[in-house]
Amino acid sequence: MSRVAKAPVAIPAGVEVTLNEQTITVKGTKGSLTRVINSDVSVVVEDNEIKCSPVESAKTAAQAGTARALINNMVVGVTDGFVKKLQLVGVGYRAKLAGKDIDLTLGFSHPLVHKLPDGVTAECPSQTEIVLSGTDKQLIGQVAAEIRGYRPPEPYKGKGVRYADEQVRRKEAKKK
């Protein structure tokens, strides 16, 4: 069995977990998340813990580890939430909020407008920073990757949209 799947997920106080066949719902102070679990994995809720185990063969052990990690992310999301920070590096690169949209100026001939999905909130503490937050880790990472994808950091000057904790590997310019 997967080492990840062997560890049970602790259910903190104030979190309600509902298991209905292969659908798990986690409700907490920050919201509610629902996910369908693979049928190769059996999920059991007992003694304020969630345990995942593979149903049949060793081939499904990896699925059990994945299911356990997803459930843990749901529990952490509804209690603490997730935050992803982006930095805009470059002359004239700016971001500003307009309702549920982020207006981005990234050196193109036109401004870019990125619509935020439900469940993701954004803040712009400065013109060159974007802070995304919410309960669903996958959704926050997806939105951050889409925004970064408009102008990924380039290796020569380091300009572009990068994650706050990302190290951009720089290259030396060509010599004559």
Swiss-Prot record:
GO BP annotation list: cytoplasmic translation
Superkingdom of source: Bacteria
Single GO molecular function: structural constituent of ribosome
Biased composition (Basic and acidic residues): 151-170
One Gene Ontology cellular component annotation held by this UniProt entry: cytosolic large ribosomal subunit
Disordered: annotated span: 151-176
Keyword annotations: Ribonucleoprotein, Ribosomal protein, RNA-binding, rRNA-binding
SUPFAM superfamilies: Ribosomal protein L6
Signal peptide: none
Pfam families: Ribosomal_L6
Keyword flag Transmembrane helix: no
Stretches assigned to coiled coil: none
Protein family membership: Belongs to the universal ribosomal protein uL6 family.
Role of this protein: This protein binds to the 23S rRNA, and is important in its secondary structure. It is located near the subunit interface in the base of the L7/L12 stalk, and near the tRNA binding site of the peptidyltransferase center.
Subunit structure: Part of the 50S ribosomal subunit.
PANTHER family named in the record: 60S/50S RIBOSOMAL PROTEIN L6/L9, LARGE RIBOSOMAL SUBUNIT PROTEIN UL6M
Stated name of the protein: Large ribosomal subunit protein uL6
